[in-house]
Amino acid sequence: MARSPGSAILAGARSPGSAILAGALATEPGPAYSGRAELKWVAPELRVLDDSPADLLVLHAFSDERPLSGLAGLVDWRLAGALSSWRIGGFSTGAFGERVLYPTGRRLSHPRLLFVGLGRRAEYRSDRALGVAADVIEAARGLGIRTLTTGLFHLEALASPLERVGPKLVHMLRSGSGLERVTIAADEEATRLVKDGIQFFGR
């Protein structure tokens, strides 16, 4: 399995046979943030991301998602096909729970990218989405991340009403230990549904 230069499989990833880099990526976790993280909504566009810097950009994709779509596809284009090349070379498969950390240099306003596998689309459910989000929060804490940008972990692709499960995801992200700001990149309709759910269910 060829390893992409500068990238690594985070320890604890569930992808069988993945190379594990233990210790090298971890930093001392910062002190727990006592309040809820600030929440910001942005459009899933590169120019908007450029104007909304954060410590970490979280991208996610299904193992059978070809080609990469949405924000992951846009970022892949900005990175000259780096994410696609991982898949072609077998470095990253998108298996459920897989996490790849990648330094972006100056190509994005986010110095580090965390690419997360969601497994097969047909097997994906809202409880899996929330589980992946919890893993991301834990990884961010271990890396000392204060601000992050993420999508909705493909909740908008599920049959479950987004206005019901979306607020649970937002609450989980905002409650993450050490996080001071969470930026969610989502289209207008998904943003409206989640916001309506937050208002109705009080999350």
Cite the ranges covered by each PLM segment.
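Glycine-/small-residue-enriched capping loops at alpha/beta junctions
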Residues: 2-3, 17-203
